[in-house]
């Protein structure tokens, strides 16, 4: 039943044709079950393992590799002679890469689907209902509850369905619904109708929501929604409807794959077509078909050369290393690609409570009355330092440090705070922090008493555990709490009845200590405490006190104020009717006003500086909270989200104000707003959608079940470490310390990772360009193969893979958080950069072909043929006069391929050293700034020597050891690449970047 909160309890019962005493009949239960189904959330129908495996092969790069592997496998079957074994190495290695990538992909997908399943932990196993088939309350399985059932809940129970309250059987009913609404304190419920069709869940005080917990009290309610129709069920439906977006990096790699596939197709076809005239050469036995197959193999080698096979592994490694660095900064990343996405975050939508603030309610101001004569009223005002539950802080009057024991009013105020209180401080030795036991508001008062130390208790030498309650203990030794008159909605206050512990004739008698909403408490005060005297409360004094409280409760302060009072001569406890809560208000009249405290959930000290950093980095911070607008705007001003006098019109909205806007106005509001107050989870999702329509990359924080859909929808969902399992499962990142500063640190890390990723992607691609140029050139010129597929795989995966991974450790730029967020649609390689890496790649290809050609033409150990003979090597035969005196087998020697491979590897090592910085010279940013890179270069060269010297690797890779003279030629051809890149960097710094700055 929608909008049950609008109806009276009697109307709701009438709609379901049920009575609170009798409950549903078995017939009604059967009908309702058929109509509404079981009261449970359906299990997530995840993708089958086979579907997940198939998905991993939808990537274009992967499909090209798969095709290359299959073709290589077929060609390997037709190999003859000693190449029969080595021919299978290439397809097997490619298949291993694909299988490994698929396993990682499937594992990540399986992990990501757990968010919806985690919702089920909030479903209780059992429920208590009243039905006509049995007298009294009966326990049944929660899944069997149907709309119309009369359900009983009591303290400690998990609510089994959405209920409309019909009767509260205790003084009050308090419910912890933080998982659903994000409210940090438990909520007092009632049974009255709420005539507001647009009330948000926080305002539906006559409703209990499935999955929330009863904090205190006992009540009856009628089930108005079950299963997917509950608020929890709606969240499940929203989560199921959210399709995961591909990250900017994934989209870029997809685009890169498309471009690469087109380029590969064109080049492969071109190589094959250009050589049609050579298909019938003698080297192929005069068989046109054999010649066609030979050049087809070269085309396949080209495909293998063009694809950076090591790229997926290097990216995964770099992101994994990034997650480790982030974890040290309290940001635990669950989804690897989101590490890079953090780097282009342009908007951070942050919860207020616990993220921007400490979620540790603290008293920061208090006052007692200094003078209350007929026409004048003067107050003693104090400020208190400290923003956490740590019982340390200073009490000041103006700039002056004060000893609270010197003010009689403060001694009495501390006494009320300590005794009219059911909370305590506890020192958590494992975490090394003080924590609350009980309600946040009351814990703030407990902490205040410790800071005030009105009896000058000696606190030296106390352990932290003892320090947690030392000053409160002293007060509690003087008075004994007899009983508590619980808080109720009508009187907005609570009180305790205390008697002195010492039977001293001079000791004061029994007292009632009262705390509550200032207007309500002061209305029942007839006098005011001035020092140790009791003075009648005049209209002037009353108005002066209320004006001060109104000032604290609004504007830039926006404190939550509590009035503290006593009843000096209460009735005898024997004469009080404690079972009738309607009498409580009479016992709490004729009060003496003692003082007032103002508290707030204080901003985290480090957050203001982080918001300034975000502003400099071009990142907009938006506060989203369930709190009221006044409090939210005040906190925004304290944090620097708004200026002290800034007009917030059009920049701060409540959920209701946002709903009143047209869809286009909502879009524009999301573009300019920096504060959303009194919002529901659905608003968060709409805010994310609107921001995404402007191509903003949004980071959204959340901790409750209600936040899960928005966390899943945002590019970066950030859950709190103290949040629910559902939120953590839906998020890409979890903050172990719940601190906004950790988000900013993670964004900085994300930017650094992206910069490093650009370096190694470009490094790998320039290598691939070189390999393509090499094979293309040999095919066009009709030269013998300089590099074979298995060698290309070795270079792409191992030799290049190690330095590429080490580039992930490059130090970040010092001005990384001074730049605007990069455009997520900006290409990895474009314009000038494309030319740069093409130039390097062409040099790599030319040098590689030159090395192989040098051996044939000039090496003393080589055949020293002419270039014309080399170009026509396929026509070599004993009866061809062009090749008189030349052994045709020399054209299949391993020396030229070894020379080419050695030049390729050495140039790539020089390239890696060049990649420490995109534009800075090696003289400004030398390679030893990244010691990991130096280690990787040494390791890669060691592996290269390994395949040259250690059997059976030379056979597998078709290589042979080189002489010292040959290594000299390799270095002569390789080292100029450093000079070429330095020249290109110089042009970048002095011409290309300057033009960008002028623009």
From Swiss-Prot:
Activity regulation behaviour? Inhibited by sarcolipin (SLN), phospholamban (PLN) and myoregulin (MRLN). Enhanced by DWORF; DWORF increases activity by displacing sarcolipin (SLN), phospholamban (PLN) and myoregulin (MRLN).
Query: Which family, according to UniProt?
Result: Belongs to the cation transport ATPase (P-type) (TC 3.A.3) family. Type IIA subfamily.
Enumerate the catalysed reactions: Ca(2+)(in) + ATP + H2O = Ca(2+)(out) + ADP + phosphate + H(+)
Tissues where this protein is expressed: Found in most tissues. Most abundant in large and small intestine, spleen and lung. Also detected in PC12 cells.
Q: Which GO terms describe its cellular component?
A: endoplasmic reticulum; membrane; organelle membrane; sarcoplasmic reticulum; sarcoplasmic reticulum membrane
> How would you classify this enzyme at the top EC level?
translocase
Q: Which residues cross the membrane?
A: 49-69, 90-110, 254-273, 296-313, 758-777, 788-808, 829-851, 898-917, 931-949, 965-985
Its GO biological process annotations read: calcium ion transmembrane transport; calcium ion transport from cytosol to endoplasmic reticulum; endoplasmic reticulum calcium ion homeostasis; intracellular calcium ion homeostasis; intrinsic apoptotic signaling pathway in response to endoplasmic reticulum stress; liver regeneration
- Mapped to this chain, the residue ranges on the Lumenal side of the membrane are 70-89, 274-295, 778-787, 852-897, 950-964
Positions bearing N-acetylmethionine: 1
Instruction: Report the function annotation for this chain.
Output: This magnesium-dependent enzyme catalyzes the hydrolysis of ATP coupled with the transport of the calcium. Transports calcium ions from the cytosol into the sarcoplasmic/endoplasmic reticulum lumen. Contributes to calcium sequestration involved in muscular excitation/contraction.
* Annotated spans, Interaction with phospholamban 1: 370-400
The record ties this protein, via CDD domains, to:
P-type_ATPase_SERCA
Query: Subunit structure of this entry?
Result: Interacts with sarcolipin (SLN). Interacts with phospholamban (PLN). Interacts with myoregulin (MRLN). Interacts with DWORF. Interacts with VMP1. Interacts with TUNAR; the interaction occurs at low levels in low glucose conditions and is increased by high glucose levels.
Which co-factor is required? Answer: Mg(2+)
SUPFAM superfamilies listed in its UniProt record: Calcium ATPase, transduction domain A (SSF81653), Calcium ATPase, transmembrane domain M (SSF81665), HAD-like (SSF56784), Metal cation-transporting ATPase, ATP-binding domain N (SSF81660)
Mind telling me which InterPro entries this protein's record contains? ATPase_P-typ_cation-transptr_C, ATPase_P-typ_cation-transptr_N, ATPase_P-typ_cyto_dom_N, ATPase_P-typ_P_site, ATPase_P-typ_TM_dom_sf, ATPase_P-typ_transduc_dom_A_sf, HAD-like_sf, HAD_sf
What segment(s) does the record annotate as region Interaction with phospholamban 2?
Answer: 788-808
Keyword list, A-Z: Acetylation, ATP-binding, Calcium, Calcium transport, Endoplasmic reticulum, Ion transport, Magnesium, Membrane, Metal-binding, Nucleotide-binding, Phosphoprotein, Sarcoplasmic reticulum, Translocase, Transmembrane, Transmembrane helix, Transport
Q: Which domain of life is it from?
A: Eukaryota
Localization per Swiss-Prot or TrEMBL: Endoplasmic reticulum membrane; Sarcoplasmic reticulum membrane
- Residues recorded as binding Ca(2+) 2, renumbered to this chain, are 304-305, 307, 309, 796, 800
- Drop me one GO molecular function for this one: cysteine-type endopeptidase activator activity involved in apoptotic process
Q: How does it sit in the membrane?
A: Multi-pass membrane protein
Where along this sequence does the record place binding of ATP? Answer: 353, 442, 489, 515, 560, 625-627, 678, 684, 706
Full protein name = Sarcoplasmic/endoplasmic reticulum calcium ATPase 3
